[in-house]
Amino acid sequence: MGQKVNPVGLRLGINRTWDSRWFANKGDYGTLLHEDIKIRQMLLKQLKQAAVSKVVIERPHKKCRVTIYSARPGVVIGKKGADIDKLRKKVADMTKSEVFINIVEIRKPEIDARLVAESIAQQLERRVAFRRAMKRAVQSAMRLGAEGIRINCSGRLGGAEIARLEWYREGRVPLHTLRADVDYGTATAFTTYGTCGVKVWIFKGEILEHDPMAVDKRMTAESEGPSSGRPPRRDRDRDRDRDRDSAA
């Protein structure tokens, strides 16, 4: 039977890049990799209420830079920055190096695959009907600009005796198109009947330039707020002069 490859891993180096961005020699690589795993586990556990989408770790010389993508940056920072100082100290104890923590706000959590999957999983744990939770997530994503979305829920849905898989899809989700910006996220709901798995694919459009940092740049631009949509003055003047020359 054909299986679906992870859309994020398939597009690494094309329009996506790695969440751990550093180089190490053979002796240190394994140690640093396990450090990254422990840092992510600790942050996701500590910031369960902060709607964290992903954690990017960079390691300049004898330093560690952690970037947290969150829909609720206020929860991460805490009152007068107290919570973020505690996190910085914990990460510094784990890495034994100087730590910098940056926070990037996710303006549209409804079209972030991981956050959508976590939201559906939390609703399943609260005994919300799975069809209602899935339909609501699909409608919200399409309303906020997604070009397509697919949601899979599997397990003993609604307390059924036999586990099954239910899915909804709206729009198009091209998994084979490498230039497509397809976000993918998973979550697990721990119910009284057992665990239910949630998978979400969200298609946000095509990225035509070959830039591994394209997705990160788009997320950062969205967090900084909406732009006016007008090109810089130099470009406008150049376009106006070109139109005038062609008319002449």
From Swiss-Prot:
GO terms for biological process: translation. It comes from the Bacteria. Keywords: Ribonucleoprotein, Ribosomal protein, RNA-binding, rRNA-binding. Gene3D superfamilies: 3.30.300.20, Ribosomal protein S3, C-terminal domain. Signal peptide: none annotated. GO terms for molecular function: mRNA binding; rRNA binding; structural constituent of ribosome. Pfam families: KH_2, Ribosomal_S3_C. InterPro entries: KH_dom, KH_dom-like_a/b, KH_dom_type_2, KH_sf_prok-type, Ribosomal_S3_C_sf, Ribosomal_uS3_bac-typ, Ribosomal_uS3_C, Ribosomal_uS3_CS. Residues 39-107 form the KH type-2 domain. GO terms for cellular component: cytosolic small ribosomal subunit. Residues 214-248 are annotated as: Disordered. Residues 232-248 have a biased composition (Basic and acidic residues). Binds the lower part of the 30S subunit head. Binds mRNA in the 70S ribosome, positioning it for translation. Belongs to the universal ribosomal protein uS3 family. Part of the 30S ribosomal subunit. Forms a tight complex with proteins S10 and S14. This is Small ribosomal subunit protein uS3. It comes from Azorhizobium caulinodans (strain ATCC 43989 / DSM 5975 / JCM 20966 / LMG 6465 / NBRC 14845 / NCIMB 13405 / ORS 571). The lineage of its organism: Bacteria, Pseudomonadati, Pseudomonadota, Alphaproteobacteria, Hyphomicrobiales.
